[in-house]
Structure formats: C-alpha cells, structure tokens
Amino acid sequence: MLNNRHSLITGAGAGIGAAIALQLAQAGCRLTLCGRSQDKLQAQAEELRAQVPDVAVLIAPMDVGDEQSVHAAVQQAQARFGPVNILVNNAGQAHSAPFAKTDAALWQQMLNVNLTGSYHCIQAVLPGMLEAAASGTPGRIVNIASTAGLKGYAYVSAYVAAKHGVVGLTKALALELARKGVTVNAICPGYTETDIVREAVQNIVSKTGKSEAEARQALSASNPQQRLVQPQEVAQSVLWLCAAGSDAINGQSIAIDGGELAG
C-alpha cells in the first residue's frame, strides 16, 4: 500500500506512536522511530521486526523541543532512507494544574513539546518532502493533536492552548501546501489508553482519593461510548490519511472520540 515510503514518527516508543509504527510497517513503509528514550525505541524496533520481519527501521533519538536535536535526527534519517514522505508528529506531554498555579515554566514546557516540537519537525523534513512530491511521491503530514485542540478542559490550560495551536498550524499549512503535493491533517483523539492517561489516572487517585477504577471511569465518562479510545484506533486513522485516495483530505482535524464532540 505504501511500499518504501519513508515515515518518520515522533513519540514512537510507546502508546499511539508505537501503534502507528506498526500500522505503517505493515503497509510497507520504511520507518524512522524518534523519541527521547533510546531504550524504548530499541524495544519498539525489536517488536516491529518480530511482527513485520522485512521492515526497514531506523532509531533516531531526538528531543522535539530542541531544534538542533531534531535536525540531527532528520539528517540521520534522510541519509539512511532519503526524504521523509510521511511525518507523524505524535510526541506530546500533558500536565494538569489550576491556571493560577501554571507558572511560566510549565506553560512554556507544554508549548515546547506539544506545539513547537511539531514546528521543528515540519521545518526539518519539509524541503525534502516537497522535492519528493514534485517528483511524484506525495507527502503527508499528520499531527496528533487532541480533542483538547477542539474544545476546552479545565486544569490543563497550557496543554489546551498548545493543542489548539497544533490545529491552527495544521489548517494554515494545509492551505500553503495544497498545490504542492503535500497534505496536512490533524487527528484529535479523546482520552486514549496511553501513558498520559495512566499518569492522569494516578493524579486523580492521589488528589481525590478515588480508586483507580473510579478514576478511569471519570475519564471514560466524556466518551459517549463510555470507554477509552485505543491506540490502534488512532493508528488506523493515520494510515487512512496516508493511503491512496486520501489526496482531497486536507486541513482537517478529525476527532477520534466516540462522539464526545458530537453533542
């Protein structure tokens, strides 16, 4: 389906990023796995090789908030596999605090990881992606945002602001690149079974005295299906946006939330 397309995925060591890596590997992509933990990336690469024996995979550790780190990782990736054809900006971080206790350091951290990181990665891969698109290989940029990019949630104001920024960046860049063979879209998952949600559960437990089951139910309650979204469901949506026939899907922010935003 996507044979030999070079896909670079940030936050690829676990959760949604790992699920996306598997989907794209099964579709025939060559993969560059990026993240801060080399051990997690190595473990994920070994898991991919076990499930997709012929996968071509490179580990390129990076901190998306560090421009030099991003450019070094992208240079390494392009030296191995050529221009990046599919960029999945998945790296993210959430931290909850009342706005009055959200200091400038926390605010900047949330923007740096969740918004500026996407900017850094797009800046680094775009020249090569555009060159490849001009030669007939379409480019895809998929930003993993959040329902927090489409609505508000209390006590995560910095995260919400950053994810709204990702949605805005997606729309603006989609228009800019619309005639250049590159599409830009955002996937906006609701609460998903990931490390971020597990940390949120522990935070609820420690601050409210609720049981873990009660905390998970509190997060699931926003989903009309009364459950957490699964990483594989997000990954399937990414594959759809990258596959043949998706050229007209551009500048969209697609909620994967069981209908949370429908009401």
Give a label for each model feature.
Residues 13-15:
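Conserved glycine-rich cofactor-binding loop
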Residues 151, 238-239, 250-263:
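Short C-terminal tail/terminal secondary-structure segment
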Residues 146:
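Residue(s) in the substrate-gating loop at a strand-loop-helix junction
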Residues 178, 183, 249-251:
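Short, small/polar-rich loop/turn modules that mediate ligand/substrate recognition or access, typified
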Residues 98-99, 103-111, 219:
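Substrate-binding pocket helix/loop in short-chain dehydrogenase/reductase
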Residues 122, 162, 170:
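Active-site helix of classical SDR
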Residues 127, 175-176, 247:
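Alpha-helical segment proximal to the catalytic Tyr-Lys
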